[in-house]
Amino acid sequence: MTTAQSAWGIGLATVTADDQVLDTWYPTGKLGLGELPLVPGEDEADVLDLPPGAVGDRALPGLRTVQLVTVLSSLADPIKDAADAYLRLHLLSHRLVRPNELNLDGIFGKLANVAWTSAGPCPPERVDELRVIERAAGRHLTIYGVDKFPRMTDYVVPSGVRIADADRVRIGAHLASGTTVMHEGFVNFNAGTLGASMVEGRIVQGVVIGDGSDIGGGASIMGTLSGGGTEKVRVGERSLIGANAGVGISLGDDCVVEAGCYITASSKLTLPDGRVVKARELSGVDGLLFWRNSVTGGLEAKPRSGQGIALNAALHAND
């Protein structure tokens, strides 16, 4: 559910000669919700307290860094431009808003496709030109990816989290304190955790994971970016999606999906009383075990007794 809350940010944008914004970085403390907090007589340029050389031309001719101020009257409004999109993504990664609490419709059309390099963002068609410049300076240019979304950690490093492979977490991911993302875990924008969680599988756009839950190695959760689906999946607290398992329905609290078991919304599940239902009828129900009967091969669901899983506290003490 989107919020009508206003927001602001003062940041640095990388801009091409034809005024295309490649990225915008809003430093910690220079963005927030509500009105832009300037005192009378204060100029936006004074707020960032930039060191010499922070703005101006970059090594690649035609590329420059500029300071800009972005003010959003409502996070429910459509995205206006790239600077607007980056502010919304920063608000998520700074944990100022939660996934699905702001309007991100059409974001792909507002972001440029960028080569993310060790020398900063670059138009993909000019990578070789930048490579020559870097080699002339005695540096080797590394290309981290060519995409519309950069790595979150190049812009925001949230407190209290561990991320084993920074390439696996996009800007706009929401990682609550106590979250651990292992090497094979992946977190997309407008997705993430609401409490201490173990992420060894994939959390796709729009999906949120409750406190104390575990997404096992190779596990996946169906999202809305492909296939035409509109329902956003939520995993409750103290739930486990086992290794190489997956879900296309929401899980309530204290649920377990057996390793290797994939439950789509239309999957037929046999209940303990013999009834057969579609999985969507159990979406969001607490205290269930989903598993595949190794004798019949059929998918089954049955109530679980007691509370859900318990994470290893030592793995989530990340401060």
Swiss-Prot record:
Quote the subcellular location field of this record. Answer: Cytoplasm
The cellular component terms of Gene Ontology attached to this UniProt record, alphabetical and capped at eight, are:
cytoplasm
Enzymatic class: transferase
| Pfam families documented for this protein | Hexapep_2, THDPS_M
Q: Identify the metabolic or biological route this protein is part of.
A: Amino-acid biosynthesis; L-lysine biosynthesis via DAP pathway; LL-2,6-diaminopimelate from (S)-tetrahydrodipicolinate (succinylase route): step 1/3
Disulfide bond annotation, renumbered to this chain = none
What residues sit in the active site? 200 (acyl-anhydride intermediate)
Q: Name one GO molecular function term.
A: magnesium ion binding
Please describe what this protein does: Catalyzes the conversion of the cyclic tetrahydrodipicolinate (THDP) into the acyclic N-succinyl-L-2-amino-6-oxopimelate using succinyl-CoA.
**Listed name of the protein:** 2,3,4,5-tetrahydropyridine-2,6-dicarboxylate N-succinyltransferase
